[in-house]
């Protein structure tokens, strides 16, 4: 149901029906509001957000079972009725927690992606991603559990570059073919959270759908009235640093070179002797990381 143009083409090819007529409906969920927030005070932000939606059904997605348990406990301690759901729980517990959510005995379910497949609760008003999803397909499916009754749904994702690094290390343990596919999907998800353009436009374009309005009015970027910023000087510094590093520098090494933070890796490459060493120390490492990603 969330097939990209490439996936649809592969399906037709593998089923040997390449000349078949295809029918698609719009991927646009006009009643959903999309937002991405920096992962700084994520627990505090989530509690505030859930309290703003007090009494309404919400799903909080986390990538690990441990984080699911931690967040569920945190919410309970802060007076928010919630239960965990992940594959590490026995089937009886999972069934009880799922039923409690569907019957509205609890308002919030904190879950891994194990939750939601085949679940149709029409009045979910809030979907939070504590961690960046592994792909835009997963993101679309999971946010799509909000507002199925046609009512308003809010979808908030918290993003940190450290999450990307964790997922990248996890992929490194996979077979080479899976690594390549996984990293490509992860790059698309990263592109979505970092885009300064309309999130709805980005998402629909990924699924091969043309969305003409430049401003959807229902995402943080379109409502934020972003201002233009001339980043030419910074971009040139980044490119010069990459060239000076002779392809040895990854994002963190580029950033550390610009702010003048020596590490064992940079010492090996003699980064201190580069013209770019400390050239960007007037800006934070977060500024340079974001600019590199853009």
Indicate where each model-derived feature is located.
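C-terminal accessory regions
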Residues: 184-210, 218
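Short helix-to-turn junction characteristic of helix-turn-helix DNA-binding domains
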Residues: 101, 193, 242-246
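Alpha-helical scaffold segments in soluble metabolic enzymes
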Residues: 10, 45-48, 188-191, 202, ...
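Helicase motor core with emphasis on the C-terminal RecA-like subdomain
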Residues: 1-176, 181-184, 209-213, 220-221
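Accessory DNA-binding and partner-docking regions appended to nucleic-acid-acting proteins
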Residues: 181-182, 212-294
């Amino acid at each position: 149901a969330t097939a990209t143009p490439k996936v649809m083409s592969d399906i037709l090819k593998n089923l040997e029906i390449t000349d078949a007529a295809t029918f698609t409906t719009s991927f646009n969920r006009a009643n959903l509001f999309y937002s991405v927030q920096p992962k700084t005070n994520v627990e505090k932000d989530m509690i505030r957000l859930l309290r703003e939606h007090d009494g309404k059904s919400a799903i909080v997605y986390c990538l690990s079972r441990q984080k699911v348990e931690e967040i569920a406990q945190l919410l309970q301690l802060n007076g928010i009725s919630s239960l965990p759901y992940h594959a590490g729980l026995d089937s009886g517990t999972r069934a009880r927690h799922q039923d409690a959510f569907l019957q509205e005995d609890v308002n919030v379910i904190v879950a891994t992606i194990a939750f939601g497949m085949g679940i149709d609760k029409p009045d979910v008003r809030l979907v939070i991603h504590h961690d960046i999803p592994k792909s835009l397909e997963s993101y679309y499916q999971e946010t799509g559990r909000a507002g199925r009754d046609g009512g308003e749904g809010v979808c908030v994702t918290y993003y940190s570059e450290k999450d990307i690094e964790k997922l990248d290390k996890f992929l490194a343990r996979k077979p080479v073919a899976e690594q390549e596919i996984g990293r490509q999907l992860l790059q698309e998800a990263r592109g979505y959270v970092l885009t300064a353009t309309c999130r709805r436009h980005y998402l629909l374009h990924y699924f091969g759908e043309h969305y003409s309005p430049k401003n959807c009015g229902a995402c943080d970027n379109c409502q934020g009235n972003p201002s233009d910023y001339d980043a030419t000087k910074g971009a040139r510094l980044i490119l010069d640093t990459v060239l000076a590093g002779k392809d040895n520098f990854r994002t963190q090494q580029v950033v550390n070179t610009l702010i003048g933070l020596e590490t064992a890796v940079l010492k090996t490459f003699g980064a201190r002797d580069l013209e770019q060493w400390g050239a960007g120390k007037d800006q934070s490492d977060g500024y340079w990381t974001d600019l590199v990603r853009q």
